[in-house]
């Protein structure tokens, strides 16, 4: 079973990498671009087939390591 964790900065938290990407896109001639925010995608291969147990395990991983709950949001997909 595969888990995907999408981590992004909370609204209001400065995102210098997103700002740099936005500036680079503008310098390449792309127009009509508003705010750019960068996040990360983490894929984890899990053993077993119990979706509820997998969700709980990945939730614990997020709280302990994968995301900083003070400045980041995360979303979990189990598939």
Please give the residue ranges for each predicted region.
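C-terminal structural segments of small proteins and small subunits
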Residues: 52-78
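Short, conserved charged micro-motifs
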Residues: 12-16, 49-56
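Short glycine-/aliphatic-rich beta-strand segments at the starts of folded cytosolic domains
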Residues: 1-11, 40-44
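N-terminal glycine-rich anion-binding loops that anchor highly charged ligand groups
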Residues: 31-37
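Short capping/connector residues at structural and topological boundaries
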Residues: 18-19, 38-41, 71, 75-76
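Short amphipathic alpha-helix segments
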Residues: 12-28
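Solvent-exposed beta-strand sheet faces enriched in polar/charged residues
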Residues: 6, 36, 45, 77-79
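Conserved functional loop/turn residues at catalytic and ligand-binding sites
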Residues: 29, 45, 69
């Amino acid at each position: 079973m595969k888990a995907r964790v999408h981590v992004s900065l909370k609204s209001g938290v400065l995102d210098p990498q997103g700002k740099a990407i936005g500036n680079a896109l503008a310098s390449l001639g792309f127009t009509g671009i508003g705010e750019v925010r960068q996040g990360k995608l983490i894929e984890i291969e899990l053993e077993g087939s119990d979706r509820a147990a997998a969700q709980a395990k990945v939730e614990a991983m997020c709280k302990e390591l994968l995301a900083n709950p003070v400045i980041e949001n995360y979303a979990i997909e189990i598939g």
